Amino acid sequence: MNEEDIISLFYAKSHLETYEVLFPLAQRGNKFATYFIGNMLISPIDQTVEADVLEGIGYLKLSAKAGYSPAFEFLGNLYAYNEKVKNDLVAAHTFFYLAALIDNKVDIGYHLMIEDEFGISEASINKSKELAEACMAVGLENCELFKE
């Protein structure tokens, strides 16, 4: 299934029905399926899937490792704003910056908004950018952000 098919399924069916279709695709590494499985596990809309934030983050990281920029943005939001996830502004900034690098939109990315909103130090910003650039250099599958 491609991205459009999965988005249509996500909004047309219950989360449980969608989960049952997407889970085998996610197991085979479909970056769109892993993103939406993660999304459903973190924020189930219709309560047909039980929330599991840690498992959801795992699926989002798989999607991000495959280069899906919305997964980086979702992870950035989780680490910056979600009360169920330990606040880590450097990680949030790095995820947002990676999304901007992937989309070639470094000048307008969410990383700039959280720099202003949270007053992140220049040292932390530089650390984040260095980590993101290192991830791009070694390949996302080898990125330090994804090592447990």
Regions found by a protein language model. Name each.
Residues 13-14, 27-32, 44-47, 65-69, ...:
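Short helix-capping/linker turns of helical repeat alpha-solenoids
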Residues 10-20, 48-59, 86-94:
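Structural signature of tandem alpha-helical TPR/SEL1-like repeats
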Residues 35-36, 53, 73-74, 108-112, ...:
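Alpha-solenoid helical repeat scaffolds
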Residues 35, 58, 73, 93-97:
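Extended, hydrophobic/aromatic-rich amphipathic alpha-helical segments that build helical scaffolds
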Residues 109-148:
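Terminal, low-structured helical/coil segments at or just beyond the last alpha-helical repeat
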Residues 2-28:
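Alpha-helical segment of the N-proximal tetratricopeptide repeat
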Residues 4-5, 36-45, 74-81, 112-117:
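Hydrophobic face of amphipathic alpha-helices that form TPR/SEL1-like repeat modules
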